[in-house]
């Protein structure tokens, strides 16, 4: 094939609607457990949805450098489309054909790539468009793919677009409900339960949406009503991993930690390489320690050994999470709700000394900025912390965070010292040592929590040694800023 033809392919391929043009992953970086989760869904999903997952799996295989395996996944997708959507096979195959063209292009098999480009062109010509068409099922295909890759805002747009053409389509409605649920953590995007209820009405067998409705009702202080939906979903889909995982989250929030651990462990049986699940189980064990401390059980005879055992379980699962590839920054993010509950309510207590309030305002500010939950809330707490300290130097630090971090010149009482050390160990490949540093950083943040939860992460001597540091009122950088700074060292 001539160079001219190769150049023409390079102009055409970006016009194809498929995984290679949807910008699914930042810098083509895929989380280690995504392939496991996609394979799990292929095993448990209804046949009509499997083609979507095979297409995504093909793209993941390509990113891993395994293009032959990618082609096999595309063959599976093509066969399933022919079986399940024979009357719409050509249109439903457009995404698969686009993926074929891209994979063959990367393999250097340009004539094969051209064959699939021509297939797309022949189908799209019927709709007066050379290489792409507007079609609700294609929007839905992209929506499910974006959703699986964590791009919830884009998924929402895709499902909304599909519903404009077919407003009562059960699949489109379920997709929109799931996308909106995942966006619900952002205050400006909160929604009513009507979207989830409509999805259940149109798809009464979709047990995952029922669990999401249960979680939403729990947030609205209607836990008993929500639990009915969760129990029904577990009864009807006892092996569906997304149902089990979300139900575990419900029971963790409820405080039924043993039930949550049981459900998370059942999910691990199907996806044993999912570091996030190990992390969640570790958090449950930490919460069990907190429960015992809050009720005074930790002082009872024989319970000290149990406390130590629970702490060890928590540490073991946290370390296992890192061994399985969980990014420590993600673990830090997942603890946001836990951290806020434990020690970020300090600024609202009028009896707390001003110095302590100022520290807490700043930590709350950093946490909000990192999670992206609310810039307004972050700014508010940052300014309130400043007004308490009345120090111009602190104002400058919040207004303009430092852009460089000195290598290994920081004293141990410097802000976020252990967090930076953890990043360094992680970059050097020493995940276990990184985990220990992150635990100490969490302990530093939680040291003055009323429940004493900081003792999970720090020894008694470290708790005492750090008291002076906590009283200095130093302004800490947020995790995102620290990551940016650490990358500048390399």
Curated annotation (Swiss-Prot):
The gene is IFIT3. InterPro entries: TPR-like_helical_dom_sf (IPR011990), TPR_rpt (IPR019734). This is Interferon-induced protein with tetratricopeptide repeats 3. It comes from Homo sapiens. Its main location: cytoplasm. Keywords: Antiviral defense, Cytoplasm, Immunity, Innate immunity, Mitochondrion, Phosphoprotein, Repeat, TPR repeat. The modification Phosphoserine is found at residues 203, 237, 478. It holds the Pfam family TPR_12. TPR repeats lie at residues 51-84, 94-127, 136-169, 172-206, 207-240, 241-274, 415-448, 450-481. Component of an interferon-dependent multiprotein complex, at least composed of IFIT1, IFIT2 and IFIT3. Interacts with IFIT1 and IFIT2. Interacts (via N-terminus) with MAVS, TBK1, TRAF6 and RIGI. Interacts with COPS5. The keyword Transport does not apply.
């Amino acid at each position: 094939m001539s160079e001219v033809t190769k150049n023409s392919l390079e102009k055409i391929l970006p016009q194809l609607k498929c995984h290679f043009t949807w910008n699914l992953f930042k810098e083509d970086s895929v989380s280690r457990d995504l392939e496991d989760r996609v394979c799990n869904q292929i095993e448990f999903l209804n046949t009509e949805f499997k083609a979507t997952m095979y297409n995504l799996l093909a793209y993941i295989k390509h990113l891993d450098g395994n293009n032959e395996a990618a082609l096999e996944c595309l063959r599976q997708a093509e066969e399933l489309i022919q079986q399940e959507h024979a009357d719409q096979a050509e249109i439903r195959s457009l995404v698969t054909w686009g993926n074929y063209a891209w994979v063959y292009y990367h393999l250097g098999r340009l004539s094969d790539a051209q064959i699939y480009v021509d297939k797309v062109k022949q189908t799209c010509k019927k709709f007066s468009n050379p290489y792409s068409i507007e079609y609700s099922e294609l929007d839905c295909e992209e929506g499910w793919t974006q959703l699986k890759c964590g791009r919830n805002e884009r998924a929402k747009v895709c499902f909304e677009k599909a519903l404009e053409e077919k407003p009562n389509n059960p699949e489109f409605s379920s997709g929109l409900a799931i996308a909106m649920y995942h966006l619900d953590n952002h205050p400006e995007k909160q929604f009513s339960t009507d979207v989830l209820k409509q999805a259940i009405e149109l798809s009464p067998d979709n047990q995952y949406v029922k669990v999401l409705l249960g979680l939403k009702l729990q947030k609205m202080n209607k836990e008993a009503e929500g639990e009915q939906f969760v129990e029904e979903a577990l009864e009807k889909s006892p092996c569906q991993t997304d149902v089990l995982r979300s139900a575990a989250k419900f029971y963790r929030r409820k405080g039924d930690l043993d039930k949550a651990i049981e459900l998370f462990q059942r999910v691990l049986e199907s996806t044993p390489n999912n570091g996030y699940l190990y992390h969640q189980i570790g958090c449950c064990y930490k919460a069990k320690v907190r429960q015992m401390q809050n009720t005074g059980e930790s002082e009872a005879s024989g319970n000290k050994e149990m406390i130590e055992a629970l702490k060890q379980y928590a540490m073991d699962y946290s370390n296992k999470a890192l061994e399985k590839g969980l990014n420590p920054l993600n673990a830090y993010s997942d603890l946001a709700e836990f951290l806020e509950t434990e020690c970020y309510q300090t600024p609202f207590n009028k009896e707390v000394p001003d110095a302590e309030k100022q520290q807490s305002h700043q930590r709350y500010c950093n946490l909000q900025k990192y999670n992206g939950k609310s810039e307004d809330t972050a700014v508010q707490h940052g300014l309130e912390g400043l007004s308490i300290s009345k120090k111009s130097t602190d104002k400058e630090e919040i207004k303009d965070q430092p852009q460089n971090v000195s290598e290994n010149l920081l004293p141990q009482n410097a802000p976020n010292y252990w967090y930076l050390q953890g990043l360094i160990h992680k970059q050097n490949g020493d995940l276990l040592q990184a985990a220990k540093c992150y635990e100490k950083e969490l302990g530093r943040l939680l040291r003055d929590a009323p429940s004493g939860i900081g003792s999970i992460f720090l020894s008694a001597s470290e708790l005492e040694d750090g008291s002076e540091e906590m009283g200095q009122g130093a302004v800490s950088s947020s995790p995102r800023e620290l990551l940016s700074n650490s990358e500048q060292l390399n």
